[in-house]
Amino acid sequence: MRIGVGVSTAPDVRRAAAEAAAHAREELAGGTPALAVLLGSRSHTDQAVDLLAAVQASVEPAALIGCVAQGIVAGRHELENEPAVAVWLASGPPAETFHLDFVRTGSGALITGYRFDRTAHDLHLLLPDPYSFPSNLLIEHLNTDLPGTTVVGGVVSGGRRRGDTRLFRDRDVLTSGLVGVRLPGAHSVSVVSQGCRPIGEPYIVTGADGAVITELGGRPPLHRLREIVLGMAPDEQELVSRGLQIGIVVDEHLAVPGQGDFLIRGLLGADPTTGAIGIGEVVEVGATVQFQVRDAAAADKDLRLAVERAAAELPGPPVGGLLFTCNGRGRRMFGVTDHDASTIEDLLGGIPLAGFFAAGEIGPVAGHNALHGFTASMALFVD
C-alpha cells in the first residue's frame, strides 16, 4: 500500500483540484489509485460538482469518497479558515464505497443502502451528514449486532443547515445520508485521543437510572466530586469548572484502566438535592467511572500517548493516515494552528496525512465503536 497527499489553497476550485490531485499522484510514485479521499473547504460548497469532476478527470480513482468541511488537514497543516482542497490517494486492494440513508417508516425507521458483512472485520471509513443521518444509531447497531466491525470517520461539518452538506461518492455529489468505504485487506490501526485526563479515583456505579447516575461507591456523585475538588490546587479547580467530563471504563476486565480505556462523556446536569448527575450515555450499575478534565495540556499529552501507543502496535512503519479532528480543537483549543497535524507528523516522521475538522468523531475505544466530541480520531495504515 502506498499513499500520497496533495493540497492546494488556490481560490479557483478547478485549479485547486488539479494542483492537489497532481501532487498526490506524484507522491503515489506511479501506483494505481484504488481509493481517493477528496476534501474541500466550506468556501467550495457551491462548486462541489466542479471540484469532484476535476479530481475524477485528473486521477481516475477506482473508488472515491469525501466531503466539503469547515476546515481541512493536509500534511502538518490545518487549514481552518481559507480556501483549500486536499486529495488523499491510496494504492492497494479494491475498495468498496457505499451510501446509507435513514428512512422513517410507519413503524419506526430503517438504515438502507448497504449491508455490513458479519464475517468481514475490515476497516470502514464513515462520513455522515449531521442533519439527515443519526450516526449514533448506526454505531449502536454495529456494536450490538456486528461486533468486530471497526469504523473510523467524522461527522461532516461543512453545512450550517439541512441541505448544505456536500458528500462525495465516486462520481456523485450528495447532500444527505452517509458516504463510506470498506477497505478489505488494508492493514490499519485506529487512534482515538479524547483529550482528557482523570482526576480523583475510579468509582463503581452503585445506583443508576438510564443516563442518570445516582450513586458512586454508595454515595451521591456530587459528594464524590466535592471530595475530589477540595483536594485540588486552585488552578486545577478552575479546570473542573470549565471542562469537567466523566470517563466510563469500556473493558471491565481491566485491573487498572489507563489512557485510551475510557469512553468520555459530558456532564449534562446535576441535582443539588439528591447529588445525582446526568451524563451523555446510558450507564449500568456495576460500571466503573472516573471524573475527567479536558484542557489544551491534557489534550496534547493524550494525543501524544495515543499516537505513540498506536505506532508501537503496527507491524511496520506507517505509510499514511486519515485524521478526523473536532472543530472545537484546532486554534480554539490550543491557541495555535496546526497542533494535531504537526504533533502527529513529528511523532510519525512526516507520513502522508489528510483529514478534516468534524462535528463529531467516530472511532473505537477498547474495541467498542463510539461517537465522540472534542476528539482526534485517526486511521493509520501500514504496507
Curated annotation (Swiss-Prot):
InterPro entries: FIST_C, FIST_domain_N, UCP018953
Transmembrane parts of this sequence: 49-69, 347-367
Alphabetic keyword roster: Cell membrane, Membrane, Transmembrane, Transmembrane helix
Similarity comment text for this entry: To M.tuberculosis Rv0874c.
Subcellular locations according to the entry: Cell membrane
Protein's recorded name: Uncharacterized protein Mb0644c
A GO term from the CC aspect: plasma membrane
PANTHER family: F-BOX ONLY PROTEIN 22 (PTHR14939:SF5)
Annotated membrane topology: Multi-pass membrane protein
Primary localization: membrane
